[in-house]
């Protein structure tokens, strides 16, 4: 006879938990919120996530890492990686107002976890550093190919794009308007044109 499946195996459970963390932040999300959002009973939840809320949050954040890893794979095979990076940023302007208000769960985590939880903060910081390296690598390759005229070192441009990403996380909350965001994004991305 087969036992109950564990909820951890269900990708949708992690996505549902991620949505609550994204909306409320780690500190404001209760175990009750997570159980309600995921439909998991207390016993099942605690048996699956022995590390409690922190473990669920770590898995939700790591799920976002997978999205960045997928983007990195696309960059590596793209004939126009700079255009792909630009499209990535420009697509943010098309997001819904609710998505603008949520911002980026990774950047949000860095801000929220400073002085609260060093492990969670460092995990989010590492994801942003990995994205920075992804941008840096793509820029470096395009400079080598002669597809990018700027002589600014790729490491500086990679950090610039992460700085822009984190600033955009705030700007989109201030101005959740597609046209305002698109204009700002295009202006900021002129550095890699």
Which role fits each region the language model picked out?
Residues 12, 16-55, 59:
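Helix-turn-helix
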Residues 73-102, 154-161:
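Hydrophobic alpha-helical connector segments
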Residues 61-67:
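Short, basic, alpha-helical segments at the C-terminal edge of helix-turn-helix-like DNA-binding modules
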Residues 151-171, 187-188:
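Hydrophobic alpha-helical segments that form the core
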Residues 1-7:
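N-terminal intrinsically disordered/low-complexity leader segments
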Residues 84, 98-119:
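Amphipathic alpha-helical segments used for helix-helix packing
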Residues 90, 132-133, 137-141, 174-193:
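C-terminal peripheral helix-coil segments that are non-catalytic and often amphipathic
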Residues 73, 83, 118-144, 156:
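Amphipathic alpha-helical packing segments from all-alpha helical-bundle domains
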């Amino acid at each position: 006879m087969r036992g109950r499946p564990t909820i951890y195996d269900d990708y949708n459970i992690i996505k549902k938990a991620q949505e609550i963390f994204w909306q409320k932040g780690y500190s404001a999300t209760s175990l009750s919120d997570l159980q309600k959002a995921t439909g998991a009973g207390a016993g099942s939840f605690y048996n699956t996530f022995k590390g409690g809320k922190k473990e669920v949050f770590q898995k939700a954040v790591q799920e976002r890492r997978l999205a960045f890893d997928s983007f990195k794979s696309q960059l590596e095979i793209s004939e126009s990686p700079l255009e792909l990076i630009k499209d990535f940023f420009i697509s943010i302007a098309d997001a819904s107002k609710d998505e603008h208000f949520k911002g980026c769960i990774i950047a949000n985590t860095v801000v929220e976890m400073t002085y609260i939880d060093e492990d969670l903060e460092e995990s989010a910081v590492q994801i942003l550093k990995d994205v920075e390296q992804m941008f840096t690598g793509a820029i470096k390759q395009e400079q080598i190919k002669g597809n990018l005229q700027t002589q600014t070192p790729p490491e500086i441009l990679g950090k610039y794009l992460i700085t822009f990403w984190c600033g955009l996380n705030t700007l989109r909350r201030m101005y959740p308007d597609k046209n305002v965001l698109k204009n700002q994004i295009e202006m900021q991305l002129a550095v890699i044109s």
